[in-house]
C-alpha cells in the first residue's frame, strides 16, 4: 500500500488533525503527506488570515516540505439570496491568500437554497453568481474547484 501511495500525491485537510498548525505539520510529516488543502490553522479560518498570517503559515509549511494543493475556502457557503457583493470581496481576499500560498486552486461551494425550494427555480441565479466568480478567478489566473454539498 505504501509503495502505491508513494507514486500518488496525497493531499488532506490537516485542520481535521488538530487546530494547531505545528501539530498538523508534525502529523503530515509522520504520514509522509506533502500536500495540504489549507482551510484553517491556529483557530483562524483561511478567509480571515491576514497577509502576515498567511506568509507565516507558508514559511512553516515550506520549512517542513509541505505544499498547499488548494485553499479550502468557504466561498459559496452562503444562501443564494444573501449579500453577494460582500461575498465577492471575500473571494478577492482568498485570491490573495492563494497567491501567498503559491497555489492556483481555490475550493468553493455552490450556494445554499432556501429550505424546500425547487432547485430549478434558482438555477439561473446560481449560474449567474458562479459565472461571476469564475471570471474573477480567471482574471487572477486561479481555478475554482466546486464541491457539491
Model-found features: residue ranges?
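N-terminal carbohydrate-binding accessory modules
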Residues: 1-4, 27-29, 58
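Boundary/entry segment of secreted carbohydrate-active catalytic domains
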Residues: 2-21
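Active-site acidic/histidine proton-transfer and metal-coordination neighborhood
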Residues: 20-26, 60-63, 79-149
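N-terminal G-site helix/loop of the GST-like fold
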Residues: 24-34
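Structural motif
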Residues: 31, 39, 100-101
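Glycine-rich, proline-tolerant flexible connector loops at the mouths of alpha/beta enzymes
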Residues: 37-62, 110-117
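Aromatic-lined carbohydrate-binding surfaces of glycoside hydrolases
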Residues: 75
Amino acid at each position: 500500500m505504501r509503495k502505491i501511495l508513494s507514486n500518488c500525491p496525497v493531499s488532506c485537510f490537516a485542520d481535521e488533525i488538530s487546530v494547531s498548525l505545528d501539530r498538523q505539520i508534525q502529523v503530515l510529516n509522520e504520514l509522509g503527506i506533502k500536500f495540504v488543502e489549507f482551510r484553517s490553522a491556529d483557530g483562524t479560518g483561511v478567509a480571515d488570515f491576514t497577509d502576515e498570517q498567511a506568509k507565516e503559515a507558508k514559511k512553516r509549511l515550506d520549512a517542513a516540505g509541505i505544499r498547499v494543493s488548494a485553499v479550502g475556502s468557504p466561498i459559496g457557503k452562503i444562501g443564494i439570496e444573501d449579500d453577494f457583493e460582500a461575498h465577492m470581496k471575500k473571494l478577492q481576499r482568498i485570491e490573495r491568500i492563494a497567491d501567498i500560498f503559491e497555489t492556483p486552486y481555490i475550493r468553493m461551494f455552490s450556494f445554499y437554497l432556501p429550505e424546500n425550494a425547487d432547485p430549478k427555480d434558482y438555477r439561473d441565479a446560481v449560474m449567474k453568481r458562479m459565472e461571476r466568480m469564475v471570471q474573477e478567478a480567471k482574471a487572477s489566473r486561479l481555478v475554482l474547484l466546486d464541491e457539491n454539498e
